[in-house]
Amino acid sequence: MKIISVSNVKGGVGKTTTAAVLSAGLTARGYKVLMIDSDPQTNLTMCFMPEPTDGTPSLYHVYAEGKTLDEVKTSIKLNLDLVIGDFELCNADMQFLKAGRLKMLRKAFKELKSTYDFVVIDTPPNLGILSLNAFLVSDYIIVPMAADSFSLKGVRLLKQTLDEVEEETEKEVSVVGLLLTKYSDRTNVSRLLEKSVNSAAELLNTKVFESRIRQATVLQESQIAKIDLLEYAPKAPVTTDYQVFIDELLNRIEV
């Protein structure tokens, strides 16, 4: 089982979209996948199902009550399950940090009885306790970066945090690559930012994926329709972008 976190401290970079399409794409390739929505905004959950009612088993219950992942997961379709997000996790740092819940997700994985080929975690756009829990269990991290704006500050902060995680756990957490999203080869901005993204990749000891994810309205349309992109718009250029990216990722992690 390979655990992949999709993370960036900056919002609006295609983090959740990447987690959703990656999960669906891996399932389409015959892998069994578990998605975990660790972002209190619950956008990954909303990509696949209506807003859950209060009391629906969620990731919050893993942290607050020690529920297992098997107890809280929801089946989306064959070979694709989801641990839904929860707005209650907005106060996770205040509620759980003092309670010693820094390794709750690790404990939950040790108790996981179901078998998966991949776990994809959508992390919050911050480096609080939810992201730290995700990093502690992850084998790989994907960092989406929008080609319309960029700052190295967040990358430096992510690097510092990952170094601390490795020091704490003595486990190497690999940033498998930076993924350029919202890309347009028609604009100078996208082309000019590529150099900065390469600098960010060097800082994180990784490489930029060759794949470029174009900006496209079908991304939002598929999320509103609660249909994964591969089914909603299989022939759209951005779908091809993501398919190429997934193949590149699998090759990079030698699957």
Question: Predicted segment positions?
Answer:
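P-loop NTP-binding core
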Residues: 1-255
